[in-house]
Amino acid sequence: MSVDVKSAQSSKSDSLQVEPRPGERDKALNLVLGQIERNFGKGSIMRLGDASRMRVETFPTGALTLDLALGGGYPKGRVVEVYGPESSGKTTLTLHAIAEVQRRGGVAAFVDAEHALDPVYAASLGVDIENLLVSQPDTGEMALEIVDQLVRSAAVDIVVVDSVAALTPRSEIEGEMGDLAVGSQARLMSQAMRKITGNIGKSGCTVIFLNQLRLKIGVTYGNPETTTGGNALKFYASVRLDIRRIQTLKRGTEEYGIRAKVKVAKNKVAPPFRIAEFDILFGRGISTLGCLLDLAEETGVVIRKGAWYSYEGDNIGQGRDNTITWLEQNSEAQEQIEVLVRQKLTEGSEVTANSMRPLAAAARTAAKKPAVSLASEAA
């Protein structure tokens, strides 16, 4: 009778390998988790289901259409980049974000690297300029160090940097005019993002970078536009917003505002590539009633026939401007319309301004998120 030596050896080795019991595996896992927390601090490792801070909460942008496109608003504890051509509404968008944070009891800071902040305009948008922290740094290193220290304090809820293009490295400022400084700003941004991103997530502070557009030289095919400061910000940003001016609003020959279109070029916390449109009125900022009227018309709450708008069978205004004026004068009807619009969106209505994408999921997500004030969260 022949015996297979190899099979006998393999069966013997298999019998020697004793798998740990489920209880022993759990003990080993708890032991290593405890050791990691002792070495690196509490919260350094956790189960995703147990981590309440992993839940991404949001705060409003100031434009209802943009809130829906973002899945609820700006995410807390993330990096946001807003870019676009000149006079497209970038600073206005961030000033509204600051006003929303302050309205909820939060602390806001504005790093004015361009030295162009208009306090009168900011106040007209609802910003509490008495309590707004403002810094006008001399160099890019100084600006980003200030941002890092504000974020580390965990006492600030939003920091706006205006803008990345104005963050000039110290070597460039101290050098002669015409000296080459290839890649110095990109290196500065790359180092800064590596340093502050982790602290942003831990503190819950939202950092919004404004950025300008440049043209790539020698690009024949494709989009020649690019943003300043290299690629680091593109990678570290959870949300990137591309804002454009698509129309100038006029009454006769008088220009009183612009129509802005925002494309969500990147979004790590909600579906990307949605589009939102809203009016920006000179001296007054984003028209919240204009956003409400647009969504009310899209969802069928307000009916438009020709130039006339009607609500519950009654004509409320001829033309868009007159209808917005009617909404301003009838706050009770305005609140009713807003409630109906939100209900329609939750039920699954589609909005063409957002690329015909159903926004029910975004509205449901926004409705489920707890309305906790920023002050109580900091406490």
Curated annotation (Swiss-Prot):
Its main location: cytoplasm. Keywords: ATP-binding, Cytoplasm, DNA damage, DNA recombination, DNA repair, DNA-binding, Nucleotide-binding, SOS response. GO terms for molecular function: ATP binding; ATP hydrolysis activity; ATP-dependent DNA damage sensor activity; damaged DNA binding; single-stranded DNA binding. GO terms for biological process: DNA recombination; DNA repair; SOS response. Residues 1-23 are annotated as: Disordered. Residues 7-16 have a biased composition (Polar residues). It is found in: Cytoplasm. One of its GO terms (cellular component) is cytosol. ATP binds at G84, P85, E86, S87, S88, G89, K90, T91. SUPFAM superfamilies: P-loop containing nucleoside triphosphate hydrolases, RecA protein, C-terminal domain. Belongs to the RecA family. Can catalyze the hydrolysis of ATP in the presence of single-stranded DNA, the ATP-dependent uptake of single-stranded DNA by duplex DNA, and the ATP-dependent hybridization of homologous single-stranded DNAs. It interacts with LexA causing its activation and leading to its autocatalytic cleavage. This is Protein RecA. The gene is recA.
